[in-house]
Amino acid sequence: MKKNYLFALTLTMWLLSCAAAEDPNKAALKLNPKPNLMNIITDTATFGEGCFWCTEAFFQRLKGVKEVLSGYGGGFVENPTYEQVCDKNTGHIELARIVFDPNEISYDELLEVFWKTHDPTTMDQQGNDIGPQYRSAIYYHNAEQKQKAEKYKAALDKSGAWAKPIVTIIEPFKNFYPAENYHQNYYNNNQNQGYCRFVIAPKLEKFEKVFKDKLKKQ
């Protein structure tokens, strides 16, 4: 009986893990349409806050965000696959590359969302997602982003908002490799999948209450 219970518990934890991906050959995937950015001055932010399915879902909903792409970065293997990253031997982190219009939403506002939508005190872990690919990370693209990220982190540390030290890495942007197509627009394509229903959906509900004034109109 105990063995059956442990098996059921292990299976449940796996089903609620970001690593339990859908079949990559699944048909009828809906990718986000590429926005026309020719006449818009945009900037880029690159964040890692655990499973990129969650990160993508948060930032997609913000006014001023033009594109969110899930991918891998920070490591040393070129064009890694999801399986390689999950093997934890590439040095890569699951990331979201966020293209935004700074006239509609600022980098400071994106940082606020970043810090408030994950636990920056757990090393290589977010909930049931465990491994170096789930590290909390900010990859800055210029000196101004570096200064703002470090200032926000220092203020959080000083405020005592978290009982444990913040372990988020703040490093210069190194590289970014887009993830496979089935990872893109993941929550919107797979809302009935277990991880989406039981992990992402409750987080989104909370997110939409906290940031209701910053959301795109549905």
Residue ranges and their predicted role:
Residues 18-218:
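Flexible coil/turn and secondary-structure edge motifs
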Residues 1-27:
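Bacterial Sec-dependent N-terminal signal peptides
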